[in-house]
């Protein structure tokens, strides 16, 4: 009879959310991450969007306990992350900013160190990534461009059978061709329906291309969280002349950009009756962010 392994194991039959966050908060002197909650199911990509300083990195670092949150609970693979951090990390692929570890070491040396930490290291997968990303293992880390450092970090993350990738601004610094290639890899990664990705970005076109869900953070608070198509479908851009700006319409607009001839504003689909007779157009994530942030009409006092 074979020995029974009593170590903590992932029960895929019982697991529903691959990642679940409840009430995550973290306060600093001039910033407060306030009650962040969300759930990510297997097989999906969640894009985490917000302007610089909105709280994306603080959320991710608090989730991973790189900074200690004030309160909140994080579950990954059905396990409490704080209580089972080592076990959870075996199934995580993490890329946080530019890869600057072991700057004077060659890539093959760094890889030799990293692979020892992962029992499920997949050398064949690593070789495929190295080839696909056109990485030269004889180069030193400090010799790589910012984009190539991101590719190398992703090659490591994709090579140990991770079930969840958590990526902070992974496409920043990549040229358009490399960025599009990376988004293709994201879609391939979740195609089996068992793996998921949470990635933060300020490049809204990335979300249009590959995100199933959008989580939008502003000033430390989650403003929107849901299916990408449903979020986009919930808003319209409305255009009109100066005489068309009625008190009812002004009250309904989320944000407005005035021009010499009139205005363009963002309005919720449910409030479209206030824009009756005016020209409207579909919104996208970029316009929703722009009119919510830059052209915000109803700002808090």
Please state what every model-predicted region is:
Residues 50-55:
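Walker A (P-loop) phosphate-binding loop of ABC-type ATPase nucleotide-binding domains
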Residues 72-80, 87-88:
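Conserved ABC transporter NBD signature motif
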Residues 86, 90, 96-152:
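ABC-family P-loop ATPase nucleotide-binding domains
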Residues 165-169:
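Catalytic Walker B motif of ABC-type/P-loop ATPase nucleotide-binding domains
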């Amino acid at each position: 009879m074979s020995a029974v392994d009593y170590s903590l194991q992932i029960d895929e039959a019982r697991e529903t959310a691959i990642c679940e966050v409840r009430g995550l908060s973290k306060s600093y002197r001039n910033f407060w991450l306030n009650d962040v909650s969300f759930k990510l199911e297997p097989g999906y990509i969640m894009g985490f969007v917000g302007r610089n300083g909105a709280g994306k990195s603080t959320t991710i670092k608090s989730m991973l306990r790189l900074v200690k949150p004030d309160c909140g609970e994080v579950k990954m693979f059905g396990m409490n992350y704080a209580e089972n951090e080592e076990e959870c990390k075996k199934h995580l692929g993490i890329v946080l900013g530019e890869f600057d570890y072991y700057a004077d070491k060659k890539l093959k040396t760094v890889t030799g160190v990293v692979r020892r930490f992962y029992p499920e290291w997949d050398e064949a997968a690593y070789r495929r990534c190295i080839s696909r990303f056109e990485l030269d293992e004889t180069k030193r880390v400090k010799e790589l461009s910012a984009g190539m450092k991101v590719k190398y970090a992703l090659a490591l993350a994709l090579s140990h059978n991770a079930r969840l990738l958590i990526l902070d601004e992974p496409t920043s610094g990549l040229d358009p061709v490399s960025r599009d290639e990376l988004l293709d890899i994201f879609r391939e990664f979740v195609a089996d329906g068992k793996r998921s990705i949470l990635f933060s970005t300020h490049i809204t076109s990335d979300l249009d291309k590959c995100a199933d869900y959008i989580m939008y953070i502003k000033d430390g608070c989650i403003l929107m969280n849901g299916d990408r198509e449903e979020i986009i479908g919930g808003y319209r851009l409305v255009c009109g002349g100066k005489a068309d700006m009625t008190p009812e319409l002004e009250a309904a607009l989320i944000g407005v950009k005035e021009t010499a001839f009139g205005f363009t504003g963002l309005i919720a689909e449910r409030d479209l009756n206030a824009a009756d007779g005016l020209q409207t157009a579909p919104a996208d994530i970029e316009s929703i962010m722009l009119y919510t942030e830059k052209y915000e009409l109803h700002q808090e006092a």
